[in-house]
């Protein structure tokens, strides 16, 4: 739903959700181009869309997601194990925000999705350890076609219990977006650059 910008923002959030959930992800016939029409086996993909700057930015976002997945073991190392995924909050109906952890053996990633067209400022989520976290993805960056609302590149966990965890992060969540944070000490070679 929404205008062209909102549709692409929703699709960026959806693909981030898809790739950060357990299991293998599949892009099908034009998803990487944000093709507005349903796939039709009787015609080719709408390759002309790569000349549209918003679709070109979306294609760069999809490439970034693939690279991020490859470089962040917490997103895939324990796909087949229950310990590889943990909800932080799956029930915030009032704010329409989902948050969860993905885990490798000695690392984790924090994923938060704001599924409304309203920014969520000072949004708190519980995390498993103290220290600094770095943002390795914000789907709202202008280079992907987003609005650059301003997800913080680095944030320090507060000693404030939240969501049943001893520490918490206070995040700025852009509208219709996904953000991924990892501990600054993380071995993930993915950088938000």
Residue ranges and their predicted role:
Residues 2-27, 31-193:
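Carbohydrate-interacting/catalytic domains
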């Amino acid at each position: 739903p929404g205008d062209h910008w909102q549709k692409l923002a929703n699709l960026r959030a959806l693909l981030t959700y898809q790739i950060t959930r357990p299991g293998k992800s599949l892009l099908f016939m034009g998803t990487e181009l944000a093709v507005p029409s349903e796939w039709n086996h009787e015609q080719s993909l709408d390759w002309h869309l790569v000349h549209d700057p918003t679709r070109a930015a979306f294609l760069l976002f999809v490439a970034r997601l693939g690279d991020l997945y490859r470089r962040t073991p917490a997103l895939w190392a324990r796909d087949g194990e229950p310990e590889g995924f943990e909800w932080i909050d799956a029930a915030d109906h009032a704010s329409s925000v989902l948050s969860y952890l993905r885990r490798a053996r000695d690392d984790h990633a924090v994923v938060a999705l704001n599924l409304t067209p309203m920014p969520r400022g000072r949004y708190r989520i519980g995390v498993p350890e103290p220290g600094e976290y770095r943002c390795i993805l914000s789907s709202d960056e202008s280079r992907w076609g987003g609005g650059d609302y301003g997800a913080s590149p680095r944030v320090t966990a507060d000693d404030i219990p939240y969501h049943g965890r001893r520490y918490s992060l206070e995040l700025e969540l852009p509208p219709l977006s996904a953000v991924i944070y990892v501990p600054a000490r993380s071995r993930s070679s993915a950088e938000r650059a």
